[in-house]
Amino acid sequence: MSFFYDGCHNEARLSVIAGPCIFESKEHALDMAGALKEICTSLDVNFIYKTSFDKANRTSSLSYRGVGFDEAYYGMNAVREVLGVEVLTDVHEAWQCGSVAADILQIPAFLCRQTDLLKAAAETGKPVNVKKGQFLSPKEMVNIVAKLESFGCNKVMQTERGTTFGYNNLVVDMRSLELMRANTPANYPVIMDCTHAVQSPGGYGTSSGGDRDMVPAIARAAVAVGVAGVFMEVHQDPDNAPCDGPNMLHLAKFRPVLEKLLEIDYVVKKGV
């Protein structure tokens, strides 16, 4: 059971998925989750902490992958037990689905068509957040959702994270948010990933670049369209983060950005 998922609806007050790109240490996870929880609680925002135990989808073997499954497991579980904060994490192989310390499983964009992975995630009974592949049209997501449903999952989230636009670049078509919602009669929550959307895949050769200054603009546009929630990777020192620093939002900017998004969300949803 996920209280976050139960409170995340397209017509409800904006929900937030936030946290650093990757799990760095138990202490760092508790610090980040605690800071984000404090902000979201003060603003009455439905919040779940995101982190990754392995960055397996990387072009270069020189890219940082993480501390490993076991260490991340105990640290992620500490966030849940010590802080009472739910956790969302991505899975890359079927065996991981039943083993991770997470309340919501996330299917990476590059793996959104992997049937065995979707099946394993669905069979856990946990909500599944599937990211739309950078190579997929929003209308094709109906097939991904149907596949999850066929394996017994009726708690699905769909996340937009941009579409490949030439080399080392992504573009966001805001129409996709409406199309993904319209495609699914169950009205599953639609989420906007505001930080990976400003990524420059492979932009630094052996790692990705990005433009974090564009995160607030992408977020405001998505909330103006109307979404269930936003996904934002946040770090207290993104310039020195192990990975994805160029597109992570600085923790110091998280609250003011979120306050503006809530103002827009209120207008769009007429005071929900």
Regions found by a protein language model. Give the residues of each.
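N-terminal amphipathic alpha-helix/helix-capping segment at the start of soluble metabolic enzymes
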Residues: 1-17, 74, 266-272
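Short, well-ordered coil/turn segments that N-cap beta-strands
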Residues: 11-15, 43-47, 81-87, 102-103, ...
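Alpha-helix-loop-beta-strand connector modules within alpha/beta enzyme cores
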Residues: 36-43, 62-88, 120-127, 177-190, ...
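Catalytic beta/alpha-barrel core
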Residues: 67-68, 82-97, 103-116, 126-138, ...
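Catalytic alpha/beta core domains of metabolic enzymes, predominantly
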Residues: 125, 129-234
